[in-house]
Amino acid sequence: MDVMKENKMKNIDEYLYKYGLHDCVVERIYVQNNSLVFCFGKGVYNLNENGTETTKTTACLMYLEIENLNKEQMWEHIEISKINKNKINEIDYEKFIEEVNKYKFDILENYLSYFGNSVLLEGYTSKNRYQIKISEISKIEFNFK
């Protein structure tokens, strides 16, 4: 295994065993440089060595760094599915961001995959249920306030 891929996996492992996003609220999502940034105004959960949620952190930003992220071609790395009465439709990144920034995004589940270095977040706004898959993540970083 090459060193770069090993470092990416180590970074994802660090995140996976350190923080939980279940029942956390994303208040805003935006792009900064090569990162997709999620704003958690009420923090995320610290996980103990068994993966159990313990305490909540302070407000934080989660940076999902994606090499060569192009704001005009977000579909290359981000797939968003809107689930409504058992119908699944793919929607634009811009429409999803607009809804999140207006209503917030409550995360029910978060999944990680080494294949494609992906994160899948499942949750809802006050209007709809969504799944958002972000792939080719080179680094995950949390910045606490």
Mark where each language-model region is.
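Surface-exposed, interaction-prone regions used to assemble/regulate multi-protein complexes
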Residues: 2-145
